């Protein structure tokens, strides 16, 4: 996986007013944390983060270049750990970066991508995907963009488990092998209607009369 360059600078304030000023200038607050850097508050370009997420994804390897107002810039190898967004607007609030070493293995989540056409779907079945990511461990440069799940051999009642997936070279699955990834279930049958009752209704009881 290629390394993406991203410029950042130390954060110069805090609070709602500061965040609003960042937004007006096309910036968002961020933080990078790790063994060497500790915790460093930053601000980065919103569009640059959007481009990384759109073109490369959350597992992009990032060389974060922190440029202070004075002194030399410092570079940190990192991945995006979390993205905080508005609950219903496509608007970034905050980005968390995690400093990594390119020489050390890490554990991360990788998206699953279904490929092929399942014969069971043609027969009327329904394909149900139970998980959309798997945990993997590998060197940062070996993080795959996605893991393919070929469903072209699935008939009704069949399933694919994590143990059935093929891991790329240098990648190990950490998700339990017994976990079901996708299953092909039979179509739902319409419930049979209860047969209508036939015959004459029993006569209503005659009320008692006094003697």
Curated annotation (Swiss-Prot):
NCBIfam families: bL25_bact_ctc. Part of the 50S ribosomal subunit; part of the 5S rRNA/L5/L18/L25 subcomplex. Contacts the 5S rRNA. Binds to the 5S rRNA independently of L5 and L18. GO terms for molecular function: 5S rRNA binding; structural constituent of ribosome. It comes from the Bacteria. This is one of the proteins that binds to the 5S RNA in the ribosome where it forms part of the central protuberance. Pfam families: Ribosomal_L25p (PF01386), Ribosomal_TL5_C (PF14693). Residues 200-211 have a biased composition (Low complexity). This is Large ribosomal subunit protein bL25. Belongs to the bacterial ribosomal protein bL25 family. CTC subfamily. The lineage of its organism: Bacteria, Bacillati, Bacillota, Clostridia, Thermoanaerobacterales. GO terms for biological process: translation. Residues 188-211 are annotated as: Disordered. CDD domains: Ribosomal_L25_TL5_CTC (cd00495). One of its GO terms (cellular component) is cytosolic large ribosomal subunit. Keywords: Ribonucleoprotein, Ribosomal protein, RNA-binding, rRNA-binding. The gene is rplY. Gene3D superfamilies: Ribosomal protein L25, beta domain, Ribosomal Protein L25, Chain P.
């Amino acid at each position: 996986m290629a390394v993406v360059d991203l410029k950042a600078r130390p954060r110069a304030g805090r609070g709602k007013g500061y965040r609003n000023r960042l937004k007006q200038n096309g910036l968002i607050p961020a933080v990078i944390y790790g063994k060497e850097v500790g915790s460093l508050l930053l601000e980065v370009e919103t569009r640059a983060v959007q481009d990384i997420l759109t073109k490369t994804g959350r597992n992009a390897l990032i060389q974060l270049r922190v440029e202070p107002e004075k002194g030399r810039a410092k570079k940190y190898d990192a991945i995006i750990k979390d993205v905080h967004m508005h609950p219903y607007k496509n608007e970034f609030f905050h980005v968390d970066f995690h400093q990594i070493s390119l020489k050390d293995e890490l554990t991360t989540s990788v998206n699953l991508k279904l490929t092929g056409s399942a014969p069971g779907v043609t027969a009327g079945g329904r394909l149900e995907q139970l998980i959309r990511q798997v945990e993997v461990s590998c060197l940062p440069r070996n993080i795959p963009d996605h893991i393919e799940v070929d469903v072209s051999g699935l008939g009704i009642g069949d399933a694919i488990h994590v143990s059935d997936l093929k891991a790329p070279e240098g990648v190990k699955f950490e998700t339990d092998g017994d976990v079901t990834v996708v299953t092909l279930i039979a179509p739902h049958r319409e419930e049979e209607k209860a047969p209508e009752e036939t015959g004459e209704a029993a006569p209503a009881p005659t009320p008692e009369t006094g003697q």
